[in-house]
């Protein structure tokens, strides 16, 4: 289980955000929506490879295509490489604000709804229970994350790692 939430057997692809060696992603870098993901492990085969890149809201857009009489959910990236199987996208991350550490997960594809959750913070700076229908789900979460913070707290927010999981749709969340 990944953070006790995502069964590993459902994971098709796992990506990690690229960052310079030894550095962390800042709030502004994440908020800009220009994160690039590198594939960590190919856990099982998909008919069409997903490119390891997320630009703006391209990856995470939900579309329904007809495959014969059956409707199939597809996810596509900026290059329109299709994944013709029903999948879910999950963002998983670790972050630190000053001395407070936490981690969270976010289901970026759920019939247009975003579900997010964070835990592990003791100082009350972050409380995340956001529900929305923005396909830029992770960027939206980060934007909402900043609401209870002042500028100094936002500048102190660092993401140790951000990972993206492409999972089969039977993930329990």
What role is predicted for each listed range?
Residues 1-173:
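Catalytic phosphate/metal-binding cores of nucleic-acid and nucleotide-processing enzymes, i.e., regions
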């Amino acid at each position: 289980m990944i953070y006790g939430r995502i069964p590993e057997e459902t994971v098709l692809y796992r990506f990690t955000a690229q960052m310079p060696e030894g550095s962390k992603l800042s709030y502004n870098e994440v908020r800009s929506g220009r994160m690039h993901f590198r594939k960590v492990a190919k856990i099982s085969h998909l008919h069409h490879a997903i490119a390891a890149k997320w630009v703006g809201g391209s990856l995470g857009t939900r579309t329904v295509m007809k495959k014969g009489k059956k409707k199939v959910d597809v996810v596509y990236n900026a290059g329109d490489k299709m994944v013709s199987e029903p999948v879910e996208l999950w963002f998983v991350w670790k972050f630190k604000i000053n001395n407070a550490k936490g981690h969270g997960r976010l289901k970026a594809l759920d019939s247009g709804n975003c579900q997010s959750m964070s835990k592990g913070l003791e100082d009350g700076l972050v409380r995340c229970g956001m529900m929305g229908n923005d396909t830029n789900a992770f960027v939206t979460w980060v934007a909402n994350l900043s609401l209870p913070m002042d500028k100094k707290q936002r500048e102190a927010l660092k993401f140790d790692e951000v990972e993206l999981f492409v999972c089969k749709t039977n993930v329990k969340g």
